[in-house]
């Protein structure tokens, strides 16, 4: 590590020491990192990670965390000697109907730029916090759209070899909130490859992608499968997200979260039929490639966990707007979050026999 009059540097990237990671995540929990290395360019990302991964790379014995927007992370408060690499390579380029975003680009900035250029396909994903590089990892989706609908290829740094290459979408094994990246590293703490850049192929007709999500279709007074003005779709999506506490607002503790903490479980058809016999009234469900997708929020509420649970002054509670969001009420720790998540997951399992899976990366902690 080199020092100069303007600070310390590692492989050309700026280094800060003894940095609290909590303010760098949307959940606002986490440890103090021994150092945070901020990479302002893709070249710095490659050089820094190659050097840290080398046998004598100067990383030390502590763990390594690679992150960008910090919107899908729960980092244990107890992690010691942590080196964090923060991706701040934020370039966005547009060539015809192709949009390329570097990993550290703010995701909503990518959506806005695409819409400003008359390109449709990303508007349903408006308002999602985080970075562009995180989107293919869990195949980010909302309101009837997923990034796998438009991703054509991803540029990667393969950590075992140090090589950089473009990988086509067909190699990424996209599924519901998953990809080859998540399948290789379920915890999100030791990725075998680092996303450097993502390319999207969008619709240059000036129309949105076809609308299928019922709540959004109704808001726009449209019909299922209809296309609309991407600007109008974006505004409708943002309004829906605000109502659910899913647009970041420093003054609103309902937004101090990782978004939906649990994915919607996909179960076998016979499991769905048994569930439908157990309860009064309809069970929200949707067709899925491998079975029937259930609504995790419905399961959570029917298991006895309502909005704002637990009542009182608990530092971590379910959002008052959306039961799938576990929120930091101002003084929560990662352990508080994990404890509540475990309580909810175990409660759903006890009532319905269904295990909910966490959506965020759990670094140094387990449910």
UniProtKB/Swiss-Prot annotation:
Q: Where in the cell is it found?
A: Cytoplasm
**Residues in FAD-binding PCMH-type domain copies:** 29-205
**Gene, per the UniProt record:** murB
Sorted alphabetically, the Gene Ontology cellular component annotations on this record are: cytosol
Domain of life, per UniProt, equals: Bacteria
Pathway in which the depicted protein is active: Cell wall biogenesis; peptidoglycan biosynthesis
Swiss-Prot/TrEMBL cofactor(s): FAD
Q: Which organism is it from?
A: Mycobacterium leprae (strain TN)
Q: Does the keyword Oxidoreductase apply?
A: yes
Q: Which family does it belong to?
A: Belongs to the MurB family.
Output the SUPFAM superfamilies linked to this UniProt entry: FAD-binding/transporter-associated domain-like, Uridine diphospho-N-Acetylenolpyruvylglucosamine reductase, MurB, C-terminal domain
- In this protein, the active site sits at 177, 260, 359
The alphabetical list of record keywords is: Cell cycle, Cell division, Cell shape, Cell wall biogenesis/degradation, Cytoplasm, FAD, Flavoprotein, NADP, Oxidoreductase, Peptidoglycan synthesis
- GO terms for molecular function, please? FAD binding; UDP-N-acetylmuramate dehydrogenase activity
Q: Reaction catalysed by this chain?
A: UDP-N-acetyl-alpha-D-muramate + NADP(+) = UDP-N-acetyl-3-O-(1-carboxyvinyl)-alpha-D-glucosamine + NADPH + H(+)
Please state what the protein is called: UDP-N-acetylenolpyruvoylglucosamine reductase
Organism placement in taxonomy: Bacteria, Bacillati, Actinomycetota, Actinomycetes, Mycobacteriales
Q: What class of enzyme is it?
A: oxidoreductase
The UniProt entry, under InterPro entries, shows: FAD-bd_PCMH, FAD-bd_PCMH-like_sf, FAD-bd_PCMH_sub1, FAD-bd_PCMH_sub2, MurB, MurB_C, MurB_C_sf, Oxid_FAD_bind_N
Task: Give the matching Pfam families.
Answer: FAD_binding_4, MurB_C
Is the NADP keyword given for this protein? yes
Q: Which GO BP terms apply?
A: cell division; cell wall organization; peptidoglycan biosynthetic process; regulation of cell shape
Residue stretches in coiled coil: none
Describe the function of this protein: Cell wall formation.
Q: Known EC number(s)? A: 1.3.1.98
Entries under PANTHER family matching the protein: UDP-N-ACETYLENOLPYRUVOYLGLUCOSAMINE REDUCTASE (PTHR21071:SF4)
């Amino acid at each position: 590590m080199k020092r100069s009059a303007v600070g310390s540097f590692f492989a050309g990237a700026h280094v800060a020491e003894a940095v609290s990671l909590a303010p760098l995540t949307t959940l606002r929990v986490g440890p103090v990192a021994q150092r945070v290395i901020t990479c302002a360019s893709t070249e710095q990302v490659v050089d820094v990670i190659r050097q840290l991964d080398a046998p004598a790379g100067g990383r030390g014995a502590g763990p390594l965390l690679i992150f960008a927007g910090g919107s899908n992370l729960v980092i244990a408060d107890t992690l010691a000697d942590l080196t964090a690499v923060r991706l701040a390579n934020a370039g966005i380029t547009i060539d015809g109907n192709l949009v390329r975003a570097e990993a550290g680009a703010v995701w909503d900035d990518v959506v806005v730029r695409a819409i400003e250029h008359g390109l449709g396909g990303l508007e349903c994903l408006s308002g999602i916090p985080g970075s562009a590089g995180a989107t293919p990892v869990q195949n980010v989706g909302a309101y009837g759209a997923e990034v796998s609908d438009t991703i054509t290829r991803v540029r990667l740094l393969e950590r075992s070899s140090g090589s950089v290459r473009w990988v086509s979408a067909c190699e990424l094994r996209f599924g519901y909130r998953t990809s080859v990246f998540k399948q290789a590293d379920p915890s999100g703490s030791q990725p075998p490859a680092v996303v450097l850049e993502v390319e999207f192929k969008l619709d240059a007709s000036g129309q949105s992608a076809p609308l299928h999500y019922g709540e959004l279709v109704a808001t726009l007074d449209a019909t299922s499968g209809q296309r609309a003005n991407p600007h109008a779709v974006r505004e409708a999506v943002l309004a829906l997200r605000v109502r659910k506490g899913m647009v970041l607002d420093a003054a609103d503790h309902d937004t101090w979260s990782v978004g939906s903490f649990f994915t919607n479980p996909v179960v076998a058809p016979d499991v769905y039929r048994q569930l439908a016999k157990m309860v009064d009234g309809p069970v929200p469900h949707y067709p899925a490639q491998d079975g029937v997708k259930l609504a995790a929020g419905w399961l959570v509420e029917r298991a006895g966990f309502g909005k704002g649970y637990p009542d009182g002054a608990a530092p971590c509670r379910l959002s008052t707007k959306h039961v799938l969001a576990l929120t930091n009420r101002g003084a929560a720790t990662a352990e508080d979050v994990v404890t509540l998540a475990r309580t909810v997951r175990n409660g759903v399992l006890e009532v319905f026999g269904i295990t909910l899976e966490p959506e965020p990366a759990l670094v140094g902690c387990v449910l």
